[in-house]
Structures are given as C-alpha cells and as structure tokens.
C-alpha cells in the first residue's frame, strides 16, 4: 500500500521535532560550559634557568593550594624562564601581559622591574633582594599602592653576615674577590656597596670581578688564579644561580674558599652559603598570589620582610680546601652536608 502523503509529512515532522529536542539537549551543556568563568592564569616570570627555578615550586604550589588553588584544576600557570639572560625579560613580561594573565609572579629584581614596566594594571607579586621602595615597585612597605606587592629578602644586611662567616672559615684572609654580574647594574651597585661597607668594617680588601656570560666566568677565575685573592664572595644573582655547578667546580679546581647566597651552591660542592630560605619565601609569595586571585588588591597587602635565613656548610669541601670549621661555627649551621 502506498503511504498517504500526509502520513509521510507527519512522520517527517516528528523526526524534525525529535532531532531539534536532541540538539537542544546537546547544546545546553555546551552553552552552560561556555558561560562558566574562565580558569584564572598565573604568569610566573623568573630570571633563572628552569632547573634552578623548579626547585622551589613545590613550596609555591603548596601555599597556593592552601588558599584553594590547585594547578591544573582551578588555576593554570604559565612559566617563563630567562635562563640568566636579563635582556629577555621585557619580551617575556610583555607576552604575559598579552596573555592577559590574572597575576604575574616575578621571582627576582630584574624580573620584577620588567613586569612593573610592562603593566600598571595586572597584579604583580614579587620576590626581590633589594629595597622595593628604592626600586620604584611600591610606594612604601606598609602601603604598597599601585599594582605590586611581595616579599623582600634583606640582601643588604645579609652581605655583612655572609662576609663575616667567610672570614671565620678563612681567618687569615686579607683580600677577598667579589664576583658581580654587570648586566644587572642596579643590583651590582647595591651588592658592591653592601660588600664594600662590610669589608671595611672587618678590615678586608676587596677585588671586583665581573661576569655575565659562561666565558666571562672562566675569565674571572683565570684572573683570580693569577692574582691569588684569599677567598671569593659570589654576590646573589640569577645568572650565577643558573651556573652554580660551573662555579662550584671552578672554586674546587682553583682551591678558592667561596661564600654563596643560596644553599643550592653548597649542595653541588660549594663551601658555604648564608641567605634567605627561598622555599619559605616562595610559600609567602604563593599565599599572596592566592589572596589576590580571591580579589584582594596588591595595594592592600604590605610587603613581607623575609625573616627565615639559613647557614649551610659542606664539610667535604672544608676538608678538601684544607680548612677547619670551628665547633661554634658548625653549631650555628642549619645544615651540615657531609
């Protein structure tokens, strides 16, 4: 029997109605998903190499998690590493601004200055070893104003302490070489001023050595070997952090007692370090980042003055250099690496 035309039309219309209903059922969750707020993005801007920078990321992620933000679940993080090349920082900061990240975490003085120059609206949480007021990052420590706040590491006060500890290990030292990175003139001037003042106070002469490339580090050590200073003071610097293995090898090869700012150098064979506990500083930065993601303004968060410092000494290196670590020195150490 030939079906009636009207029955065919009715069947066709029913199929259309079913498909329309199905299409609406599929489209509804897609539309609802599109209406959900976008996942916030944190932009991490760092001067160091990846292998150095990732060492303290667990502390940052932990405190961020305590504020309710878990990477990959309800927050995304984009990492940009300058690998010790400060000239790359402006473009890396500009990328994060173009990416429209929710907040920029800047983990060094050069990175913080690059971030501040790139935006006056995106919140910035910094970690710096210099006075953030003098750097122009904030109006004051208690009332930052603007779009930036963070953690200050007290580098100036640490220089005198670090130099004094080096003198305890090498009491016969009369002249100390100071290694600085000229590609960061602001930090170099600050570091040199602090070390010169500390050296005068304890009767030490200093010799300045400059290096901003791998080759220049080798050249600096050749000069050091030729002129034979009694010890070496390596100023805190992101490029030097990235070259910590090279520096530890060279100090061992030339038998130079050397003082560093971070424990990472001592873990790869350096003699001693005294400085900020970077993991603790990253925890503080993570906490501030989480609060800003919740809507707190950087201007309302006072700059945190880092107060957790650590002395680390490598006893194997002490012996290899023919030195003796006094018992009271070892007693003050937060960690002794055998």
Question: Where do the PLM segments sit?
Answer:
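Short hydrophobic alpha-helices and adjacent helix-cap/hinge residues
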Residues: 1-338
């Amino acid at each position: 029997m030939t079906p009636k035309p009207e029955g065919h039309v009715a069947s066709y219309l029913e199929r259309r109605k079913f498909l329309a209903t199905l299409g609406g059922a599929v489209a509804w969750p897609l539309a609802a998903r599109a209406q959900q707020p976008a996942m916030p993005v944190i932009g991490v801007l760092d001067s160091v190499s990846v292998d150095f920078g990732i060492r303290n990321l667990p502390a940052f992620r932990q405190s961020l998690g305590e504020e309710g933000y878990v990477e990959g679940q309800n927050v995304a993080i984009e990492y940009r590493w300058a690998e010790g090349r400060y000239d790359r920082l402006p473009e890396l900061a500009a990328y994060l601004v173009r990416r429209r990240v929710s907040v920029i975490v800047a983990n060094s003085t050069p990175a913080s200055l690059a971030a501040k120059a790139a935006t006056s609206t995106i919140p910035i949480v910094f970690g710096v070893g210099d006075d953030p007021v003098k750097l122009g990052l904030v109006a004051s420590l208690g009332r930052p104003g603007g779009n930036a706040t963070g953690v200050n590491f007290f580098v100036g006060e640490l220089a005198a302490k670090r130099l004094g500890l080096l003198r305890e290990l090498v009491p016969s030292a009369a002249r100390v070489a100071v290694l600085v990175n000229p590609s960061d003139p602001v930090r170099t001037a600050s570091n040199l001023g602090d070390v010169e003042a500390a050296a005068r106070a304890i009767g030490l002469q200093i010799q300045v050595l400059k290096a901003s490339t791998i080759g220049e580090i080798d050249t600096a050590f050749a000069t050091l070997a030729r002129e034979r200073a009694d010890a070496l003071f390596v100023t805190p610097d992101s490029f030097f952090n990235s070259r910590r293995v090279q520096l530890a090898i060279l100090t061992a090869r030339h038998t130079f007692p050397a003082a560093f700012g971070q424990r990472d150098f001592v873990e790869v064979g350096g003699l001693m370090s005294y400085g900020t506990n970077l993991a603790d500083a990253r925890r503080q930065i993570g906490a501030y980042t989480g609060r800003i993601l919740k809507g707190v303004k950087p201007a309302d968060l006072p700059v945190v003055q880092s107060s957790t410092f650590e002395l680390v000494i490598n006893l194997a290196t002490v012996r290899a250099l023919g030195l003796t670590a006094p018992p009271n020195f070892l007693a003050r150490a937060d960690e002794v690496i055998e």
